[in-house]
Amino acid sequence: MAVTHTWSVSDQLQTRTQDGLSEVVFSVVWRLNSEETVDGTTYSISSANQISLNTDNLDPATFTAFADLTEAQVLGWAKDTIDANAAEGEGVTCAEWEAGHDRNIAKQINPPTAVETAPWATANP
């Protein structure tokens, strides 16, 4: 089975008035939840971060009123910003976040290290 990645954004959005427009969303908290179930055991990891959206050069003709926003739209802005920041050398892309979660879950399923009792230790002191 493969790792399932689910992106979301918090429903608590930071807004401000800008360029004559009200309730401009300028900051959101995104979350990436990833999981895989193997032989009935579910392995998971979650990451989240607050990100500032680029609100430069807002166009009133294409501006979406706060009441009309959808989670998919705001999530798209967040993911676009994550990728744009990575392109400028700040952080990693969405695909790299997912790949990191893949690696983490693979290590949970097959730990690269183990804890073993030393050979000189005995069960009966």
Briefly describe each language-model feature range.
Residues 57-125:
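Acidic, low-complexity intrinsically disordered segments
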Residues 31-64:
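A short, structured beta-strand/loop element
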Residues 1-44:
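Short, charged/polar N-terminal "headpieces" of proteins
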